[in-house]
């Protein structure tokens, strides 16, 4: 009896035995994944157009470093030409290492500017001791950056908010403001003068942290508000971290849901015409009673009263 030998299996690429090689391979995969996610977000929301001048708001934190790094890499192979300028707002915080960002940016060869504005003194004077400074600090910082964009021909303002920021903002609005709202990947500023983009909208914070560590970015901690405890955001952040541990994929599903809104399955009358639903044929809308009439009827005395 002739024995049937099994067919030889194709040889897979052997895993590197050297831990350093394994780490390098993992870092390479991570970088490619981030590039793909950033490129997808730019494409999905039309974030960058030919000839755009994109201002990358660089704080010295892991998110903005990663944002700049990704855009620099994509710029070299992007389907459209665009320029970049990195802008940091020096808020005159005590002990702020003002030399770090200029040295880093000169090493990259990227155009940059340092905008000096003493928002630290303003925030410290206005906000009572022990209170979170984040809200006022954010408004002042945004105003200074918008002013720079207005006077320097910037067409897009790129911020470093990531997927977890967007989901956390959704829950903060839900829990504390009773509204369904998050952070838009692309928006026009309230004054209508600026277009703001968030190219990291599809990127997990954990991936950004790992990438920043691998790239050894010179992280600058925020001594004004970044080290303060914003209780609401902290609580939501812990909730998302718990879900990530116990229910992998749940936060990703929530993020995807923000792009699949069904107004007819909610209760916002400004988004869906519930009054027209079920109206027969071409019946004019003026045949519907004034909604206030139903309220009046509910409060009217009964015949037996």
UniProtKB/Swiss-Prot annotation:
Q: Which UniProt keywords apply?
A: 4Fe-4S, ATP-binding, Cytoplasm, Iron, Iron-sulfur, Magnesium, Metal-binding, Nucleotide-binding, RNA-binding, Transferase, tRNA processing, tRNA-binding
Q: Where is this motif: PP-loop motif?
A: 59-64
Relay the cofactor remark from the entry: Binds 1 [4Fe-4S] cluster per subunit. The cluster is chelated by three Cys residues, the fourth Fe has a free coordination site that may bind a sulfur atom transferred from the persulfide of IscS.
Q: Where is this region: Disordered?
A: 1-20, 282-305
List, as start-end ranges, the regions of compositional bias called Low complexity.
282-293
Q: Does the keyword Membrane apply?
A: no
An annotated GO BP: tRNA thio-modification
Q: Where does [4Fe-4S] cluster bind?
A: 134, 137, 225
Which reaction is the catalytic activity of this chain?
Answer: cytidine(32) in tRNA + S-sulfanyl-L-cysteinyl-[cysteine desulfurase] + AH2 + ATP = 2-thiocytidine(32) in tRNA + L-cysteinyl-[cysteine desulfurase] + A + AMP + diphosphate + H(+)
Group of enzyme by EC: transferase
**What EC number(s) is this enzyme filed under?**
2.8.1.-
Annotated signal sequence is none
Which CDD domains does the UniProt entry name for this protein?
Answer: TtcA-like (cd24138)
State where the protein is found.
Answer: Cytoplasm
What cofactor is needed?
Mg(2+); [4Fe-4S] cluster
Gene3D superfamilies in the record: HUPs (3.40.50.620)
**Pathway membership of this protein?**
tRNA modification
An example of a GO molecular function for this protein is: magnesium ion binding
Q: State the source organism's domain of life.
A: Bacteria
Entry GO CC: cytoplasm
UniProt xrefs under InterPro entries? Rossmann-like_a/b/a_fold, TilS/TtcA_N, tRNA_Cyd_32_2_STrfase, tRNA_thiolation_TtcA_Ctu1
What family name appears in the similarity comment?
Answer: Belongs to the TtcA family.
Miscellaneous comment in the UniProt entry for this protein: The thiolation reaction likely consists of two steps: a first activation step by ATP to form an adenylated intermediate of the target base of tRNA, and a second nucleophilic substitution step of the sulfur (S) atom supplied by the hydrosulfide attached to the Fe-S cluster.
Assembly state and interactors?
A: Homodimer.
The task this protein performs is described as: Catalyzes the ATP-dependent 2-thiolation of cytidine in position 32 of tRNA, to form 2-thiocytidine (s(2)C32). The sulfur atoms are provided by the cysteine/cysteine desulfurase (IscS) system.
- Recorded protein name is tRNA-cytidine(32) 2-sulfurtransferase
Which organism encodes this protein? Xanthomonas euvesicatoria pv. vesicatoria (strain 85-10) (Xanthomonas campestris pv. vesicatoria)
Write the lineage as a comma-separated list.
Answer: Bacteria, Pseudomonadati, Pseudomonadota, Gammaproteobacteria, Lysobacterales
């Amino acid at each position: 009896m002739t024995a049937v030998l099994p067919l030889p299996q194709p040889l897979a690429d052997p895993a590197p035995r050297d831990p350093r090689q394994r780490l390098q391979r993992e870092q390479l995969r991570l970088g490619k994944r981030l590039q793909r996610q950033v490129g997808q977000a730019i494409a999905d929301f039309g974030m960058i157009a030919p000839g755009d001048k994109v201002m990358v708001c660089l704080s010295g934190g892991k998110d903005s470093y990663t944002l700049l790094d990704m855009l620099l890499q994509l710029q070299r192979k992007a389907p459209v030409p665009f320029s970049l300028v990195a802008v940091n707002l020096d808020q005159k915080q005590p002990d702020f290492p003002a030399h770090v960002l200029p040295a880093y940016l000169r090493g990259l060869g990227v155009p940059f500017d340092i905008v000096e504005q003493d928002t630290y003194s303003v925030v410290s004077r206005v906000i009572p001791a022990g209170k979170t400074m984040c809200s006022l600090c954010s408004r002042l910082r945004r105003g200074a950056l918008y002013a720079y964009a207005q006077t320097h021909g910037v067409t897009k303002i790129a911020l470093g908010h990531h997927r977890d920021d967007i989901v956390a903002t959704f829950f903060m609005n839900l829990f504390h403001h009773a509204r369904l709202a998050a952070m838009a990947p692309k928006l026009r500023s309230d004054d209508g003068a600026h277009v703001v983009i968030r190219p990291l909208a599809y990127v997990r914070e954990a991936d950004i942290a790992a990438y920043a560590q691998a790239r050894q970015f010179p992280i600058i901690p925020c001594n004004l508000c970044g080290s303060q405890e914003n209780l609401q955001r902290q609580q939501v952040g812990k909730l998302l971290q718990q879900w990530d541990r116990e229910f992998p994929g749940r936060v990703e599903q929530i993020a995807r849901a923000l792009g699949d809104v069904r107004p007819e399955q909610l209760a916002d009358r400004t988004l869906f015409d519930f009054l027209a639903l079920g109206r027969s044929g071409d019946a004019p809308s003026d045949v519907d009673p004034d909604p206030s009439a139903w309220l009046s009827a509910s409060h009217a005395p009964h015949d037996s009263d």
